[in-house]
């Protein structure tokens, strides 16, 4: 009766909207769990409608589309807490899944610190008018490829993903809400010989996407990489572009999760109220931002999302909480649940005053970094880490790019590198790709005295 792939469904002889379908699923599961003895239930059915276009060697190679419904559920039996996910929502399969949850509840240990779900909230529907337009996406891919090749790239590859996510929430505490959000992500990589470049664009509206700019950026980076330069290991001033900056700032956001603080994997443990980063740096999480690619009206516990300042002028102001971590920290949920771990929705970093060209002048002599991968922590609790630069790393002398570098690895401490920011750019952009899971809105930034080692001979 319920099918996985669809935007509208036939239900008892009539067509219903996705909102009603998700609510019907949630109510069915919630009522059955309460009938079977659950004292509290929170059900979140989700429909994800996506179109992905991959391109390689200047041509589209793969087009995939999907529309999938799944159900996440938190159920509480006395002092026992169970988290479940159902991906087969056919009537028989759903009944079998519920039966399995009931049986498995006998194996779950009781929790002595179980916080009740928050007071019920009925949320106003949040809808999107955005559509996934395959023809327009194809045009955007062509624009990105053409602008990259005009800049000198020999080969252009990448992926464009358009998604509309529809979430509902039904709680035994009376929580009820429906939320729709659209996101469009374009990631472009360029190649000339052994050199590579990267550009990207992210938005919640297709009209705000900048495919030509993303292609132009990736193409210009690979063009500049044709002039190799020599370098030695040591401490350098660096200009972090938004892509690498977002990846590194994301780890600061992870350290703000109260779950990671308790688990001993946060470098911000015991530092509440202390100045831990540069006064230039203010970081907030904002799950309510209309421009945030991951924004939603409610978190997984039915708490309204909001803007939470995590670090203000370098001083740690707040961790991210769900109701259980909030109880243990004697505070309130910040609207960031995760039934297991609270996490950021969208990270937003304050901007500075400099253009990119002015940032290069401020750097004067150092290294400009575009992107990175293979970030590894030697010690999560202290923030000691390394990461390898990719897709454009450049030697800067007297405020001008003089040559490209290979095999550059940052080997330093996360808190240390952000404790002495020299300047921030004035232009911010959203960054999200497979190395940056939490969308981050930030400018470029100049950091002094960053320790660099060689990942390969260069």
What is each residue range found by the language model?
Residues 19-31, 36-52, 92-179, 212-246, ...:
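Acidic low-complexity segments
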Residues 38-71, 156-177, 364-389:
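Structured beta-strand/loop patches that form or line metal/cofactor-binding pockets in enzymes
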Residues 51-106:
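N-terminal alpha-helical targeting/anchoring segments
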Residues 64-77, 176-203, 310-312, 389-398:
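Short beta-strand elements
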Residues 271-458:
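Dual-mode signal for accessory low-complexity, basic/Gly-rich regions
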């Amino acid at each position: 009766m319920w099918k996985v792939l669809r935007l509208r469904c036939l239900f008892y002889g009539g067509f219903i909207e996705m909102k009603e379908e998700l609510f019907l699923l949630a109510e069915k599961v919630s009522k059955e769990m309460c009938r079977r003895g659950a004292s509290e239930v929170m059900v979140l059915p989700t429909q994800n409608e996506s179109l992905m276009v991959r391109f390689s060697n200047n041509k589209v190679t793969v087009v995939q589309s999907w529309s999938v419904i799944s159900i996440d559920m938190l159920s509480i039996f006395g002092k026992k807490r169970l988290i479940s996910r159902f991906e087969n929502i056919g009537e028989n399969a759903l009944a079998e899944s519920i039966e399995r949850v009931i049986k498995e509840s006998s194996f779950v240990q009781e929790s002595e610190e179980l916080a009740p779900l928050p007071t019920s909230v009925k949320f106003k529907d949040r809808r999107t008018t955005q559509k996934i337009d395959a023809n327009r996406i194809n045009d955007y891919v062509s624009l990105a490829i053409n602008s990259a090749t005009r800049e000198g790239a020999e080969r252009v590859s990448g992926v464009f993903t358009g998604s509309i996510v529809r979430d509902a929430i039904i709680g035994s505490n009376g929580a009820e809400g429906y939320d729709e959000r659209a996101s469009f992500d374009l990631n472009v990589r360029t190649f000339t010989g052994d050199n590579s470049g990267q550009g990207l664009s992210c938005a919640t509206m297709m009209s705000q996407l900048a495919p030509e700019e993303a292609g132009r950026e990736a193409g210009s980076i690979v063009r500049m990489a044709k002039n190799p330069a020599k370098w030695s290991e040591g401490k350098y001033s660096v200009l972090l572009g938004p892509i690498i900056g977002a990846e590194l700032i994301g780890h600061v956001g992870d350290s703000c999760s109260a779950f990671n603080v308790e688990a001993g994997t946060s470098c911000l443990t015991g530092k509440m109220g202390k100045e831990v980063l540069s006064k230039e740096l203010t970081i907030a999480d904002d799950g309510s931002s209309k421009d945030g690619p991951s924004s939603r009206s409610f978190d997984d516990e039915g708490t309204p999302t909001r803007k939470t300042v995590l670090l203000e002028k370098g001083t740690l102001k707040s961790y991210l909480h769900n109701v259980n971590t909030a109880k243990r920290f004697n505070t309130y949920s910040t609207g960031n649940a995760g039934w297991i771990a609270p996490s950021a929705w969208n990270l937003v970093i304050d901007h500075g005053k400099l253009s990119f060209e002015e940032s290069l002048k401020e750097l004067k002599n150092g290294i400009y970094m575009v992107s990175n991968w293979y970030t590894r922590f030697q010690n999560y609790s202290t923030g000691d880490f390394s990461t390898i630069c990719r897709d454009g790393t450049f030697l800067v002398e007297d405020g001008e790019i003089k040559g490209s570098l290979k095999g550059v690895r940052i080997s330093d401490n996360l808190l240390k590198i952000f404790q002495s920011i020299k300047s921030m750019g004035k232009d911010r952009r959203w960054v999200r790709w497979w190395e940056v899971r939490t969308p981050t809105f930030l400018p470029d930034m100049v950091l002094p005295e960053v320790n660099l080692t060689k990942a390969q001979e260069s």
